Amino acid sequence: MSNRKLAWTDAAWDDYLYWQSQDKKTLKRINKLIKATKSQPFEGIGKPEPLKENLSGFWSRRIDEANRLVYAVDDNYLTIIACRYHY
């Protein structure tokens, strides 16, 4: 298990709160992706892929067909950038 701390952008936290009230199944999937990403940020479930161009430095994992978990990671933090919609 990683010692990375979890951080959220304001927009990502709003996305997360949306899922809490609208779709518990999607919320469970997001939580599962976050847990996996904390320990293995660049491989595993959700088909992790590095983003390009203006999103260079961020990574993405599939929540479902329409939504993505977008995040940045370093040695200390996993920062959730978005968890709703497709970048």
Residue ranges, per PLM feature:
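Enriched for short, Lys/Arg-rich terminal
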Residues: 1-5, 11-28, 45, 51-52, ...
